[in-house]
Design a protein with these regions (language model features):
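Beta-sandwich/jelly-roll carbohydrate-recognition scaffolds of carbohydrate-active enzymes
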Residues: 1-157
Length: 157
């Protein structure tokens, strides 16, 4: 994948763990409940991916967006993420791998406003989370504490 979006409680917590007993997979759909109680559902249309995240009550509601990770022979050459408004991000990832100049562009629309947006490049935080462009960008998006609300990307189900 060219973009990695993951639910997170806090940026320092690292990867969420899960048991295969808590997974469901079929063509075009995947669901898992992580050990931290976050339920994740992923689905697709012909042109986009749809994510649903349901967080435990009174927990932080956050996502990480990682454009730095490369798989197999792929090498990231440039990435960018920009906050368009309180619910929309746009960006791109350029890489070399199966194509010499592969470009993936994206728009992410949330069903809730972002309360905190922290950008990182080369694991150093940026002071201004409005736009990041670098060889490798990583974004932490915090939606604050909600009461068991579902965060959807995009908001239509």
């Amino acid at each position: 994948p060219d973009t990695s979006i993951s639910p997170a409680a806090y940026i320092q917590s690292g990867y969420a763990r899960f048991s295969h007993r808590n997974e469901q997979a079929e063509p075009g759909y995947y669901s898992v409940v992580f050990d931290n109680g976050i339920k994740t559902e992923l689905s697709v249309t012909n042109r986009c991916g749809i994510h649903y995240y349901q967080y435990p009550a009174n927990s932080a509601h956050a996502l990480t967006i990682d454009l730095t990770t490369a798989r197999n022979w792929d090498r990231t050459t440039e990435t960018s993420i920009r906050k368009v408004n309180s619910r929309t991000l746009e960006g791109y990832r350029k890489s070399q791998g199966w194509a010499n100049d592969q470009r993936v562009y994206f728009i992410i629309e949330f069903s809730q406003d972002c309360e905190v947006l922290a950008g990182y490049k080369k694991f150093s935080p940026l002071e201004n989370g409005q736009k990041i462009t670098d060889k490798g960008c990583y974004l932490y998006v915090d939606f604050g504490q909600k009461t068991n609300k579902i965060l959807a990307i995009p908001k239509e189900r």
